[in-house]
Amino acid sequence: MIFLFRALKPLLVLALLTVVFVLGGCSNASVLDPKGPVAEQQSDLILLSIGFMLFIVGVVFVLFTIILVKYRDRKGKDNGSYNPKIHGNTFLEVVWTVIPILIVIALSVPTVQTIYSLEKAPEATKDKEPLVVHATSVDWKWVFSYPEQDIETVNYLNIPVDRPILFKISSADSMASLWIPQLGGQKYAMAGMLMDQYLQADEVGTYQGRNANFTGEHFADQEFDVNAVTEKDFNSWVKKTQNEAPKLTKEKYDQLMLPENVDELTFSSTHLKYVDHGQDAEYAMEARKRLGYQAVSPHSKTDPFENVKENEFKKSDDTEE
C-alpha cells in the first residue's frame, strides 16, 4: 500500500490542486444557475460533458491502479516468462484508436445539436414576437437600443420575462463579447459586423452581464445589470421613458464614443438614426477625432484627453493616469 501511495502521490496532488483552483473560481458559478431556456440548455450540455469526461477519467484511473498493483515488481515474482521484445498487438491498437474517436463523436453530437438549436428562438416561446435589442459595445460601456420602442439605455437593460430577446450585437471599436451567464453564453461583438443571439429570462430578477473579451484598461468595469420584469412592468417602463427621458442627440452620442466609464443612462431615442455600427466600423474613431481625443501609446505621458472638453457622461469618480 505504501508503494501504491507513493506511485499515486503526484496524481493525487495534481487532482487536489485542480479541485482547489476550479472551485476557487466557482464562488459565483452563475453559469450553473440558469434562469432561462437558453442558459438551461447550455448548462445541461456542460454537466453532460463534465459527467462523461469524469467517467472516462474514472475508468483510466481504475485501469491504471489495476495494472500498477497486478504487475508491480515484488519479492518472489517469477520474471522468467518476461519477453522485452514486443512486436505490437493489432487488436489493442485498433481498440485504443477507435475508443477516442467514439468519445469525440459522443461529445460532438449533443454539442452540435445544441449549438444549432440556439440559433433560433426558444421552442417554448417561438410563437411570441421577440423583443429586438441592439447591443453595442464601446470602450468601456454597453449601449442598448430598442428600435421598436425608440429607447436607448447605457450600462443597464430592461427585458420582459417569458419572451424571447433577439440581440443584434456589434461593437463601435474594440472586439468585445456580450455575456449574461444566467441567461446564456457569450457572443462576440465586432465593429462592422452584426451578430444575432436569442436569450430569454424565465424568472423576474436582476442578472449581471459583462464583457467577456479583454478590451484594455477598464475592461473589468464593463458590466451591466439585466432587469427581468413582468410584461406589464416593462410596458410601464417603456411608456415612462418615452415621456420623461431626454432625447439622444448626435453630439451626446459622440461623447459616448470616448473610451471612458459612465454611469447608467436612459434616452427616449436611439443612435440608430445616426449610425449603424454593423455597417460603419469607423464611426467611433471619427467621433473621437471630432471631440479632440488623440489616441496615444499606453506608455506615453501625453494625455489623450488634453484637447477634449469635459464629458458630461463621465463618471465623477474616474481618475486618469
Swiss-Prot record:
Gene3D superfamilies: 1.10.287.90, Cupredoxins - blue copper proteins. GO terms for cellular component: plasma membrane. It comes from the Bacteria. Residues 300-321 have a biased composition (Basic and acidic residues). A lipid is attached at residue 26 (S-diacylglycerol cysteine). Its EC number is 1.10.3.-. It catalyses: 2 a quinol + O2 = 2 a quinone + 2 H2O. This is Quinol oxidase subunit 2. It comes from Bacillus spizizenii (strain ATCC 23059 / NRRL B-14472 / W23) (Bacillus subtilis subsp. spizizenii). The lineage of its organism: Bacteria, Bacillati, Bacillota, Bacilli, Bacillales. The gene is qoxA.
